[in-house]
Amino acid sequence: RYWFCWCFHFYYTSLVYILSKASIINALLIVNLYFIAVYISLTIYILLIIISFINIFYIMIVLPVNIFIRKQVIFMTINDLKDKVISGGLITIDDALFLSEADLDDLCKAADEIQHTFFGNDFDICAVVNVKGGKCSENCVYCSQSTCAKIPVKAHAMISPELLLRHARLRNLHDIRHYCLVSSGKRVSDKDIDKICSGIKAICRDTKLSVCTSFGLLGEDQFRKLKEAGVVRIHNNLETSRRYFPYLCTSHTYDEKIATIIAAKKAGLEVCSGGIFGVGETMKDRIDMAFTLRDLDVTSVPINLLNPIKGTPMGDFAPLTKEEILRITALYRFILPKQYIRLAAGRNYLPDSGFSCFKSGANATITGNMLTVKGISMDEDIRTIKEMGYKVI
């Protein structure tokens, strides 16, 4: 309003001054220009008034309504996506990004319902044994056995078949199903595979354990040899998304890992593949990896949590919070409804040892000690899991 009055006053005084010095023809022209200027100013003034009313209407009515509707949509969308998954559908990346910001309690409750729909009360437990450790050729920045770690890790060659069988018999005394043999290095040599195969055959003969192996980037022929010895599943983590992988490791590639998984499936083996979380990745990286795993149709998905170890490049990283871990677990259950979501390394630093994850979509775990760090007691794990209503398969 003040702007319009100022313009009108300026035009009027200018007009009076010019007319006092102009001819009649020029005066008529100036008067016309004057009214045109007044018309333009009046139009702008009216437009400003309209815009002001629109802003007031948006702030007082539209914005509060949008906020209310969004809250309703969020609640309904979690349930809609849950129903979609339970009915056999698959969520999209956009759906997953939406869920990554949804209410955590509602998300975990829905994930638990999805898990029980597809698996009932079945729970899978795995134990690991380090059959060859130390002197790893790879430069994974999170690992204490890596070439870039400044930690004295005792190295040992491939253990004998006899010692392997003794370890397996001890594990067989517990109520566990899978027994995973893990080796350091980029890949196990053909000589070591021949050596370990005799031990695998003995385990299959003398125990009820299902043998898994984590022997690195093997080829289809090597996987077939392991399958003939009795191996049912191989482990090969993608670790993170394709985008972020070069920040974690440069001594081998993401494509090599995917090729290994494809080769194992061609050999008739199940695949256990997941990643490590809390290494600087974004939520989008976590989601991208989950969708890659879904495309690869893996059987089991380990969720490893970075346990910062002094002497590694990530030794000063802050561990993920319990809430972040619950969100990852629940989100993975939505994306991977028919896979075992396996809480793995890093459980020991959680206040409840990660048991709350077993009510948020996870239905499998690795128990006992890990490769280079202490884990959760097998007896404690099995007892608590059964008390939660699960049946260990």
Mark where each language-model region is.
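Tryptophan (W) side chains
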Residues: 3-6
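Flexible, acidic/Gly-rich N-terminal and inter-domain linker regions that tether
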Residues: 17, 50-138
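Auxiliary Fe-S-binding modules of radical SAM enzymes
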Residues: 66, 70, 74-102, 294-393
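Short functional micro-motifs and their immediate structural scaffolds
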Residues: 141, 145-148
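Core AdoMet radical
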Residues: 148-167, 171-261, 270-274, 299-304, ...
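Short, electropositive alpha-helical surface patch
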Residues: 193-201, 229-235, 283-299, 353-367
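Active-site glycine- and acidic-residue-rich loops that bind
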Residues: 214-219, 276-290
